[in-house]
Swiss-Prot record:
The gene is rpsN. Belongs to the universal ribosomal protein uS14 family. GO terms for biological process: translation. GO terms for molecular function: rRNA binding; structural constituent of ribosome. The keyword NAD does not apply. PROSITE patterns: RIBOSOMAL_S14. This is Small ribosomal subunit protein uS14. The lineage of its organism: Bacteria, Pseudomonadati, Chlorobiota, Chlorobiia, Chlorobiales. GO terms for cellular component: cytoplasm; small ribosomal subunit. Keywords: Ribonucleoprotein, Ribosomal protein, RNA-binding, rRNA-binding.
Length: 89
């Protein structure tokens, strides 16, 4: 389980990215890099980390499901992920 502060920091970044998304897109299109530089660093989408929605784990996360590999395996074996089953051929 990731620290609550790390999860909160990532959530804050997600909110900042959403807040400045339009302005950032306009500035990039206009080529105004001086104004881009003055925006908050955390308003860049690059700084947001994909994290598991259950555990907050930052590595081994399947973006399609929003789950880390451990939780994905656990939930799929329990049958709690619709349409997912163990491969057999």
């Amino acid at each position: 389980m990731a620290k609550k502060s790390v999860i909160a920091r990532n959530e804050k970044r997600i909110k900042l990215v959403a807040k400045y998304a339009e302005l950032r897109a306009e500035l990039v299109k206009a080529g105004d890099y001086e104004a881009l530089r003055k925006l908050p660093r955390d308003s860049s989408a690059t700084r947001v980390r994909n994290r598991c929605v259950l555990t907050g784990r930052g590595r081994g996360v399947y973006a399609k499901f929003g789950l880390c590999r451990h939780m994905f395996r656990k939930l799929s074996l329990e049958g709690k992920l619709p349409g997912i089953r163990k491969a057999s051929w």
